[in-house]
Amino acid sequence: MNILLANNKLRYLGGTETYTYALAAQLVKTGHRVEAFTFRKGLISDRMKRDLGVPTTNATGKYDVVLANHSTTVKALREKKAGFIIQTCHGVTTALEQPSPFAHAWVAVSKELSAHVEAITEVKTPVILNGIDCHRFKPVNPAGEKLTKVLSLAHDDALNDVLQDHFKKYGIKLFRLNKRKNPVWDVEKQINQADMVISLGRGAYEAMACGRPVLVVDRRPGRELKGDGIILPENIEELIACNCRGQAYQNTNIAEMVKTAVENYSPRLGEWCRQYALENLNIGKQTEKYIALCKKLIWYMY
């Protein structure tokens, strides 16, 4: 298929940006012709061109399908008559993530989002989870038998200070990696140096794919602290239903979440995380779902 991937920006590291890269890589790998559309080029679009041979285009041609992530790109590409547009919605609150009336169909990355999109569009919205490249994000160094090093991918400095103090009480070191301040492309190397990772959303999934237990908590700019605690077999479905964004439990008790994470830590939990990622978050499986949906919808429309 001739496929156009669209993202508002491909300039810096971000959730939808790395998602777009992973999807592009898998589509190219499986024989599809892929191009990208964005309003702001940069690090990600450059990597897509260099690593994958995926060029950034003004979308003057016609595509079999457009897989777009933001309402801005949907509107622009509908005006260009670029092709059948499927918008993937990644968030509930951000204006860019709201379902656009200019899309032909919608996909949501979680059950929570699916319900949100359906309430607006009155159209049944399938769920396709965030896809992770499990060949790239994989266990290289095994997690330690004892929890000694935690990597925080949280954005909020004040939260990281509090987390560091709490982990220090257990003799555990906390290291920080904020993609806004010190972006690192090959974050999987940093993840593999830690025993546990703190993150939300896609960062949590990447850590799981690397075989690391994950503590879901962060405070994003202009938003309240949100946490779901440590990901466990007994709560994973509830957390995944909200894209592991801290919305399932909305826990604000950091001391309690850290204590529970420390008590439940085990390298075996990391092994379970890896297996879950392979079975449910693998970009190969998610891409297959997109292609099947594309064929179904395009056949129905035409």
Give each language-model segment a name.
Residues 63-70, 79-94, 104-108, 217:
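Active-site proximal beta-strand in glycosyltransferases
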